[in-house]
Amino acid sequence: MKLLFRQRFFSWFDSYDIYDEDGNTVYVVKGQLSWGHCLKVFDTSGQELGTVKEKILTWLPKFELYEGSSYVGCISKELSFFKPRYDIDCCGWHVEGSFRLDCRGWQVDGSFLEWDYSMTGAAGEQVAVISKEIFHMTDTYVLDIVNPVNALRVLMFVLAIDAEKCSRSSN
């Protein structure tokens, strides 16, 4: 399953669609005005599926992930020089190195500029590949997800990293 989204400028208080490879809307992401970023993910019928919410009053950015009203985990920016690092505590997820994530056996490796990610399972099977198309006015991500069951969590992971990057570039 492939998902595509194009983030628009100033979209944190707006909404944008997440498309499948045929151009059909699969999810709708809506930004809400709040202290810190708050992004809600809806299906096409308007049912809320997930939330990415920035915690405020933290020294470094931290985002909590929810599926429906259930807390899934959080993604925290770590202090580092030259290469961004994150600590991911989500259903047993753990980060080793800059973009090494372990969640239920999943691992995520990413590039220096945070444009490309590869997610693999405990047995080495591929969970998803996330890439950023660079020749656009706004960020355009392609999420190639092997099992559609993982689509929401993969999407929320990308939304949280993108929100942190947006905060970093606006400072």
Task: State what each model feature region is.
Residues 1-171:
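Intrinsically disordered, low-complexity proline/glycine-rich segments
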